[in-house]
Amino acid sequence: MPDRVKEHVFALDARWCDELEEVLFSDPVPNLYSIEHYLSCPLPVRAPRIPLHYYQGFVGCERDGQLCCVLLLGSNVVPVRWCGAAIEYDVAEHVEASDAPTLDATALAHRDALAQLLLQVGSRLDSMFGESAFVMPLWTRLQELCEQSRGGKSPLLQMLQPSLRDGCDHRARVLSERPNQPLLYLPPEKDLARFYAVELPELPAHLPAPLKPGESPAGAFQPSGEPAGYARLATSADLGELLPAAAAMFTEEVGFDPIARYGEGYAARLRTLIAGQRSAIVTDVNGRVIFKADAGIVNLDAAQVQGVWLHPDYRGYGLAKPFFAAAAQILQRHYPHLSLYVNDYNARALAMYRGTGWEQIGQFSTIIFER
């Protein structure tokens, strides 16, 4: 297999700042993760002299001196732009094969080079996610390269296929493949109060009631603004109850225990969210967190909502809509432009989001790997 990585892919350095910023900030809502990384880890003055598959940061390809492909490389890979994506993805979704325009040689070479780079990264990959138009063509080509590498010593092939003797099973180590995840946006002008300023349904006697506004435990500090409905911002005093709730959400959604994998780093992440007034919660009268939603990724006045979770004991009683609307109202006071993405098979969640004013503006895809 020719080494297309050396031929086409390079680490972005400070010379590419203007072009990278144009890519990221021209459409900030789907690019919030990459923007957050860019602002916290600016491009280096000079490109590092290490093999790219060991590099963590932005890499790209150029066409006629212009940046045409961008990929954020790390344990979590985010394809930000690919010069052939519009053609290939639109064709796959909307155009008959006989009428399909063909990708030019440069677009094909760039796609192959980026896929080959991920093949070299191998078992360090935890996930790949981003806009479907960029993720899915790259993921498809990556699987094809795994097939072509059959019998070789590709690290990613060994990750996806524990035993080469069993034949090529390029999904053997894929924990979850989620090709269709609607990207939703909540317009700032939406009236959320009508969803949360309501009487809650009656709950079974064995369930502790949600804590009503104004009945916070003595000494609890509300760092900013008023509660909305039954939701409020989490404080440092809530960490002990928030941690198991967040871990339960993560395990349900992703498929593994974040505390077991990330240890203290996961609790540190929650502390950061609390300190930044980015975690909205509902507790029961005993202080247990029964609902949560976070502004997981933020930039200026925009945030991506993550970690939406309702305790299993409280599901099926019509609480998700008023709790989530209240949490979104609180987060929107700090970040008027809220977005999130959700699995298309989660019909109940999709209905709840759309029923509280969220509108689809795009589509994400996520591939999660086992370690």
Segments (PLM) and residue ranges:
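Recognition helices and adjacent regulatory flanks at domain boundaries
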Residues: 281-284, 296, 317-330, 341-343, ...
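Conserved acetyl-CoA-binding loop of GNAT-fold acetyltransferases
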Residues: 143-149, 166, 328, 354-363
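Conserved acetyl-CoA-binding loop-helix of GNAT-fold acetyltransferases
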Residues: 103-117, 307-310, 316-332, 350-355
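Conserved donor-binding loop and adjoining core beta-sheet/short helix segment
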Residues: 2-11, 22, 28, 36-127, ...
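Conserved beta-strand-loop-alpha-helix junction that forms the acyl-donor binding cleft
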Residues: 129-135, 312, 340-351, 366-371
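Acetyl-CoA-dependent GNAT
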Residues: 73-78, 254-255, 264-306
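Acyl-donor-binding surface of acyltransferase catalytic domains
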Residues: 74-226, 367
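Short amphipathic alpha-helix that is part of the acyltransferase structural core
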Residues: 1-36, 202-259
